[in-house]
């Protein structure tokens, strides 16, 4: 099936000023990126992904290919939520492939995915990274409005993230929601309506100190909102995964933002040390 939208983005590191930049970019159909900007002085470049069509319909296929070269850093966000409407013609699909070079960094924090009544959505993300690179992803799934006020009026949701490091799989996260099989109760959504997943795979950053700091953040946010949020942290090779359940996106964003603040603090120290080392040996 021909993609309804395509995006190819290649990010490289410029040694003269330490900035990351788009070495090449290509888009076609219903995908675009806004003009890049630099949110801080560490050289990371930020791109905003937009879908001028406003949402996904049945049969839509979107292909995204991102490569971050050695020493480069990219922040990728979206302009608005990913909205999945009725899909009688077949599922809406988004396929993303990411390649990270040595000491490369990708931070992907899109707006929530909203799946409306009668919608089916499949999302696959494959990350190929070096053991010296960093990958962060934070996603939230929100049920769309339904005329009968049910939280799970959509037909099906499947979000799969696969992370490969040096050719070895270090993470396979598989989120499947099929409301025909009751997902609201124990062992699935536990009575909550919104779910969040934050993945950080970052061998240069994720030592015991960082892991314990992240654990403390999760517990602190969890206990500050007893009854409004459930969350847990699992350690994986080179990093960790945080899964959250809540009644609204804001509670999940709260825990994501706290973890991302920790991550950015550690990243700044790491990239600063890398830069100092590079200057020392140049």
Curated annotation (Swiss-Prot):
GO MF: nickel cation binding
Chief location: cytoplasm
Compartment(s) of residence: Cytoplasm
InterPro entries: UreD (IPR002669)
Example of a GO cellular component annotation carried by this entry: cytoplasm
Keywords: Chaperone, Cytoplasm, Nickel insertion
Disulphide bonds in the chain: none
Record flagged with keyword Cytoplasm: yes
Keyword tRNA-binding: no
HAMAP family linked: UreD
Homology family: Belongs to the UreD family.
Function (record text): Required for maturation of urease via the functional incorporation of the urease nickel metallocenter.
Subunit structure: UreD, UreF and UreG form a complex that acts as a GTP-hydrolysis-dependent molecular chaperone, activating the urease apoprotein by helping to assemble the nickel containing metallocenter of UreC. The UreE protein probably delivers the nickel.
Name of protein: Urease accessory protein UreD
Protein source organism: Corynebacterium efficiens (strain DSM 44549 / YS-314 / AJ 12310 / JCM 11189 / NBRC 100395)
């Amino acid at each position: 099936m021909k993609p309804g939208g395509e995006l190819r983005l290649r990010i490289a590191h410029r040694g003269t000023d330490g900035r990351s930049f788009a070495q090449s970019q290509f888009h076609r159909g219903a995908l675009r990126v806004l003009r890049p900007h630099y949110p801080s002085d560490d050289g990371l470049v930020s791109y905003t992904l937009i879908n001028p069509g406003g949402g996904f319909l049945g049969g839509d296929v979107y292909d995204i290919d991102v490569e971050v070269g050695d020493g480069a850093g990219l922040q990728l966000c979206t302009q608005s939520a990913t909205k999945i409407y009725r899909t009688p013609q077949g599922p809406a699909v988004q396929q993303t492939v990411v390649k990270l070079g040595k000491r490369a960094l990708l931070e992907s924090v899109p707006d929530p995915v909203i799946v409306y009544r009668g919608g089916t959505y499949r999302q696959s993300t494959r990350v190929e990274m070096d053991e010296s690179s960093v990958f962060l992803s934070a996603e939230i799934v929100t049920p769309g409005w339904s005329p009968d006020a049910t939280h799970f009026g959509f037909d099906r949701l499947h979000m799969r993230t696969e992370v490969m490091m040096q050719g070895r799989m270090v993470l396979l996260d598989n989120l499947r929601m099929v409301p025909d099989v009751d997902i609201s109760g124990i062992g699935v959504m536990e009575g909550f309506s919104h779910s969040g997943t934050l993945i950080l795979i970052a061998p240069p950053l994720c030592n015991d100190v960082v892991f314990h700091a992240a654990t403390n953040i999760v517990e602190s946010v969890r206990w500050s909102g007893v009854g409004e949020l459930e969350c847990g942290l699992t350690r994986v090779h080179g990093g960790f995964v945080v899964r959250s359940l809540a009644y609204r996106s804001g509670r999940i964003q709260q825990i994501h933002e706290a973890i991302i603040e920790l991550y950015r603090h550690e990243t700044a120290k790491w990239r600063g040390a890398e830069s100092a080392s590079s200057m020392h040996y140049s």
